A protein has these predicted regions:
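Mobile genetic element proteins and their domesticated derivatives, centered on retroelements
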Residues: 2, 27, 50, 58, ...
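RNase H-like nuclease module associated with reverse transcription
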Residues: 71-74, 143, 182-343
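Alpha-helix capping/termination and helix-coil
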Residues: 54, 90-97, 117-122, 151-155, ...
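Structured nucleic-acid-interacting core domains from mobile-element enzymes and related host factors
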Residues: 88-150, 215
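RNase H-like nuclease fold core
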Residues: 50, 138-190
């Protein structure tokens, strides 16, 4: 990627920036001149390279690329400058790799699903639909953790929000989703319900996927969101719908929670991992609370030693991991964990 950048612009990427885009940036408001045909090809090439980076694990730039890819047909000079910044950010943090943690997250302090009476609600008493033709489960069970978020009026021209969902197997992120919503919501409450519907769809997919692979799945999925009003409306049978046009998402989320295997809980925004999939985040706060605990990064290998018995690297006194917890129980301490690094 860096060599292609050098070929296009005859210079190395500027690596002074510590985030993909400036916090609170709105590229749709850019009024700089349009690019010519040759520059458009370069712009599309940069977007394609960045999308490839996302597919191999660099989802910290996904919100920026989701936004910038909308302008591929007619990009402006300011859009090209923003893409150059994203490439510079990737080159600056080129050592970022996903940490693979295979031990179970500690949710001992997390409250369980409240014993609400869903049987006498409109959803009735029903359980999870488990595939009958799945192979018998073998091996260590997997605990699934999901984070979801919505960014209201991400695009100020259309008023549309962005949905962000991230799924963890044990303590490892394996699936990330970032997409602009198709409708313009008038309140965060409605945008969060659309994101809640998406995370429920993801839960169904991942649990079925693991069962068909023959892996035992934990009887409960942990789902974290930062809009308490939406979560209360979803988890309490007596709650009322505040926005009628969200009625389908409202009933879908509540019907899934009534099955008893989704534990949807509130979490502070600064610990919500899906926040980086919905907003143009800044370095301060976001990097240390969300980015650093998930990615292996240059300079943290001093805390690693090679354990010949495990044949993997083991982290000692990993403060970033202790901060992570896996973000759900908010700063719960972790035991030293096995780490395997991939690109």
């Amino acid at each position: 990627m860096e060599e292609a950048y050098l070929q296009h612009f005859k210079e190395r990427p500027n690596q002074k920036h510590q985030s993909p885009l400036q916090k609170g940036d709105h590229p749709e408001l850019d009024t700089t001149p349009f690019l010519d045909e040759k520059e458009i090809e370069i712009y599309m090439s940069l977007v394609g390279s960045a999308q490839w980076s996302i597919s191999i694990g660099r989802f910290d730039i996904q919100t920026a690329i989701m936004t910038m890819s909308k302008f591929r047909s007619a990009p402006r000079r300011g859009h090209l400058d923003r893409m150059k910044r994203v490439i510079g950010y990737l080159c600056k943090f080129r050592h970022f790799m996903i940490r693979f943690r295979v031990d179970e997250p500690d949710y001992s302090n997390v409250p369980g699903i409240k014993n609400h009476d869903w049987e006498h609600s409109v959803y009735g008493k029903h359980e999870e639909d488990v595939p009958l033709n799945a192979p018998p489960p073998l091996g260590k069970r997997i605990i699934l953790t999901h984070y979801f978020d919505a960014s209201l009026m991400h695009d100020v021209l259309s008023g549309k929000a962005v949905t962000g969902v991230c799924t963890f197997y044990q303590k490892t992120p394996v699936d990330w989703f970032c997409k602009q919503q198709s409708t313009s919501e008038t309140a965060t409450y409605g945008a969060e319900f659309l994101s809640g519907r998406k995370v429920c769809e993801k839960i169904i997919d991942h649990r079925a996927y693991l069962r068909y692979l023959g892996k035992p799945v934990c009887e409960m999925d942990y789902v974290w969101g930062d809009n308490e009003s939406m979560i209360n409306s979803s988890t309490i049978p007596d709650s009322k719908l505040h926005k009628r046009h969200n009625i389908l998402s409202f009933h879908f989320v509540r019907s899934m929670i009534s099955r008893g295997y989704i534990n949807m809980l509130h979490i502070d925004t600064k610990y919500n991992f899906a926040d980086i999939l919905t907003k143009h985040w800044g370095y301060q706060g976001t990097y240390y609370e969300l980015i650093q605990p998930v990615f292996h990064h240059e300079g943290n290998t001093a805390a690693l030693f090679l354990d010949d018995t495990l044949e993997v690297d083991v982290s000692i006194n990993d403060e970033e991991s202790m901060r992570f917890g896996i973000l759900g129980s908010e700063r719960t301490s972790l035991q030293p964990h096995a780490v395997t690094l991939v690109v």
